[in-house]
Amino acid sequence: MPMIQRLSLSLALTLNWGVRVASQESELFDEITHVEEEISRFRSTTGNLQDYIPLLRLDPFSRNSKKAAEMRIRRDKYLGALNRDLDDRMEKGTHTPCIQANVILDKEAKLNTEELTSISLTMLSGGLDTVTTLVAWSIGLLSTRPDVQDKAAQAIQEMYGHDEPMCSADDDQKCAYVAALVRECLR
């Protein structure tokens, strides 16, 4: 699962801040995935009884409330670091195009810090939750459908042959079956 989480996190970080996670052994990877998993548990329909039993909200010793506050502090720390890093790169003119930079540079957008943070949180938690689940589901599906794997392999071999690299920088996704398979898995 860490490789799938790294893919999800790298996609979210690249799209929103124009950076990637170097490896699944990095401290940033560990911190973000841990905190976002904990926050996801709080948002779960079964993970936080305080949402359904109001009396539990009055408990001053609630572990959930303390843990939620701790996760908020930790999340704010890495969000702040990612935002400062992007601000530095934008100031130097070395940033790559990304959602956050595009919104900041858009004179008509005029979003405040809270709105930018909301976009960032949506990209981060939404990406980790959905992409990770999606890729795991797709791998599970393919593991039970060797006929789909065989058809994809045959389509790739017909298109590229045995002497060409399958994943070149010039790949224009002309392999119709594989492109359709990916789109179907993304639904």
Give the role of each language-model region.
Residues 30-38, 94-102, 141-187:
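Cytochrome P450 I-helix active-site segment
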Residues 1-135, 151:
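Cytochrome P450 heme-thiolate monooxygenase catalytic core
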